[in-house]
């Protein structure tokens, strides 16, 4: 699936500006750590130090215009915004002014959200490659070529980069050298971004399955089959895997066994990647709603209808939603 955002990049920066309002959202101590899709390797999307900040005013600080759609989620580290664009570039921008610091050109769309760890930017491209770039200069450190487009966002854990590809595979790569460590082949495209917790990689595939894989060997630990394609990226919190499916459901699965704990049905496909904070699961649906789902057997929920298809990300208590159009490839 290719997801096209129908709003400008300046709107994305407006939402980032909300995080900066009144205080720096991510302290320097945290910024030296792994900053990646949905904040960390578990993809729960909850960064508690943001909670309680003054984020009531969404004042536009600046905007930066690329030459095409921006489907990549920005990563903000040490005063720099890293983001990809469908114009084939990865950009590094000054987080205060929006000035371009550098850009790196790939040979395809960059919808993958960068992971920035220890001075290295890891990102995928539709040119079939995963790139490691110097975070300061944008120089290429290494690249690894898969057999399909890479829309999945890389996840870094313990010196290994985990990422999916439209060639149906999940890859584990050495973060320093880019050397191949293992791959696991599903029966469909892997757009989902892997979540890693307690030595297990959790990822969805458009073969309708959610997979749990041994992070060291790639061996299958368990598989859970949903009723639709799984483009949603799993989130892991407190021993539970949360993930959406094209069957319109959000699932909570036991992280150890894969057993279904509960399911919550929305009105349409769930591409959105759930975020989990304070016992509540936040997720968007193509039915136009953003849902807050109580974690006790999904017994309680609230929804808000913004009037467009929803993709959602949550950091602390700040939710960012934006309109999307989709087509399947």
Where does each model-flagged region fall?
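Secretory targeting signatures
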Residues: 1-37, 290, 295-329
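Extracytoplasmic/lumenal domain signature
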Residues: 25-71, 75-302
